[in-house]
Amino acid sequence: MQNNEEPYNTGQYPSGPHGKKSPRLHKCARCRNHGYATPLKGHKRFCIWRDCQCQKCSLITERQRVIAAQVALQRQQAQEEELGIYHPIPLPIAAVIKREHGGSSSQLMLESSSTQTTSTPTSAEWIKEEEVAKPAAGLFAPPPSSEEMGMTLAAVGAADAATQTDQPGHLFNMMSAMIQQLMDMSWELQQGWI
């Protein structure tokens, strides 16, 4: 153990003078995965687990990549807004689910409410009811491999430039959803469910 590392403390007991909690300092996430609380400042190049490829460290690496891409997108949008280039596109407010019983299996119709009005139901998508129930059933499924995670990020990166400039809000929402999935997976790993 290096001199600036200490065994992981849950923070149940206040530290500092007069029992007051000291301000929260950033700790190395990789060290935290392996049971140590190491201050982050000046530590990145010397981290023992810098090249660790365990499941938790791989998840942290993916989360860091996604968050970095999200921050870059936010900065780009702010810069475009300052220059007067950015034109926000209204996103769907809510999805309305309609159930239709017909044929052998029941189906759900997802409609997104938006400001555009069309006479044809092109914005509606038909899916089977079993497909809607899959995320709840897959809650305890094994986590995706790093190759699958890479393919997910590659799919986001493969969006053509026209889509990114025409609909920056759409890409931002996709990245936010990916971050939420990574955070959920991280939480499940910490709980020992995976």
Curated annotation (Swiss-Prot):
UniProt-annotated location(s): Nucleus
Gene3D superfamilies found in the cross-reference section: DM DNA-binding domain
Pfam families in the record: DM, Dmrt1
DNA-binding region listed in the record: 28-75
InterPro entries hit by this protein: DM_DNA-bd, DM_DNA-bd_sf, DMRT, DMRT1-like
Segments of this protein annotated with the region Disordered: 1-23
GO CC list: nucleus
Record keywords, A-Z: Developmental protein, Differentiation, DNA-binding, Metal-binding, Nucleus, Sexual differentiation, Transcription, Transcription regulation, Zinc
Bias kind Polar residues: ranges: 1-13
GO MF terms, alphabetically ordered: cis-regulatory region sequence-specific DNA binding; DNA-binding transcription factor activity, RNA polymerase II-specific; metal ion binding; RNA polymerase II cis-regulatory region sequence-specific DNA binding
A GO BP annotation: female gonad development
Tissue expression notes: Expressed exclusively in the primordial gonads of ZW tadpoles. Specifically expressed in the somatic cells surrounding primordial germ cells in a ZW gonad at stage 50 during sex determination (at protein level).
Main location: nucleus
Record-stated family: Belongs to the DMRT family.
Function: Transcription factor that plays a key role in female sex determination and primary ovary development. Acts as a sex-determining protein by antagonizing the transcriptional activity of male-determination protein dmrt1-a, acting as a dominant-negative type protein.
Name of the molecule in the record: Doublesex- and mab-3-related transcription factor DM-W
Gene expressing this chain: dm-w
